[in-house]
């Protein structure tokens, strides 16, 4: 995770690309490994089937790159219980989704269907060893992120 329980600012915890604020991403990490001589087929890209949240986040830039206090993690199932409180956004430079609850001042970072599809395609296009996720019990039983991952791999 690029952002999580030790972070004092919000950010994407599992971005494919680098966002406009930070350099950490799956792509930059993969490139760093390849620059060290690691063969692409030995590299596995990761995806998160859980949501990290931050509280006490000011309503600036929809909560992205703001001072915050790390809060809790959700799985895909229990996040549905609070989903209606959030406005969802897509960061095109990071290829990552995020959400912000302006009433409760909570920022959420996660992978979604689109980011999982992009990561799966990236793994295939760059001849990586594969894609992994953590953790299956956090996914929905119907139309979850694993299905998106499998479908993206089958399509390519």
Model-derived regions, located:
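Glycan-binding loop/region signatures in secreted carbohydrate-active enzymes
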Residues: 44-122, 148-156
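Active-site rim elements
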Residues: 17-20, 104-111, 132-133
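Substrate-binding surface in catalytic domains of secreted glycosidases
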Residues: 1-79
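Acidic-and-aromatic substrate-binding clefts and catalytic sites of carbohydrate-active enzymes
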Residues: 136-142
């Amino acid at each position: 995770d690029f952002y999580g329980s030790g972070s004092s600012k919000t950010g994407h915890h599992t971005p494919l690309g680098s966002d406009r604020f930070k350099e950490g991403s799956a792509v930059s990490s993969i490139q760093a490994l390849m620059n060290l001589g690691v063969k692409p087929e030995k590299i596995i890209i990761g995806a998160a089937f859980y949501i990290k949240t931050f509280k006490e986040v000011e309503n600036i830039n929809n909560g992205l790159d703001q001072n915050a206090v790390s809060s809790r993690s959700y799985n895909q199932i229990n996040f549905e219980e609070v989903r209606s409180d959030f406005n969802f956004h897509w960061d095109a430079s990071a290829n990552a989704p995020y959400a912000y609850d302006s009433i409760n001042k909570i920022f959420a970072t996660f992978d979604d269907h689109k980011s999982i599809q992009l990561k799966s395609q990236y793994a295939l296009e760059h001849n990586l060893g594969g894609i992994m996720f953590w953790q299956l019990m956090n996914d929905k039983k119907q139309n979850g992120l694993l299905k998106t991952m499998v479908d993206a791999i089958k399509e390519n």
